[in-house]
Amino acid sequence: MLKIIWVILSIVLIGLIFLRTPQNQGLASFSTKSNLLGSPSSAEQFLNNLTIILMIGYFSFAVFLNFSI
């Protein structure tokens, strides 16, 4: 059961990382950048926090499954 949760968590984490937009898009991003000083918007901050939480969960499951074998 834990292995299934671990696989689902890894797939969701990979999908979340691929959905993220790149931070540096060259000189064209300066003209279209709406937020001053590069501060992330609330949605981007939420994605950052969600990614960190899922990574901690992924590594916790990896350590737990490694010791249970």
Swiss-Prot record:
InterPro entries: SecG. This is Probable protein-export membrane protein secG. One of its GO terms (molecular function) is protein-transporting ATPase activity. It holds the Pfam family SecG. The gene is secG. Involved in protein export. Participates in an early event of protein translocation across the chloroplast thylakoid membrane (Potential). One of its GO terms (cellular component) is chloroplast thylakoid membrane. Disulfide bonds: none annotated. It is a multi-pass membrane protein. Belongs to the SecG family. One of its GO terms (biological process) is protein secretion. The chain crosses the membrane at residues 1-21, 49-69. The keyword Disulfide bond does not apply. It comes from the Eukaryota. Keywords: Chloroplast, Membrane, Plastid, Protein transport, Thylakoid, Translocation, Transmembrane, Transmembrane helix, Transport. Coiled coil: none annotated. It is found in: Plastid, Chloroplast thylakoid membrane.
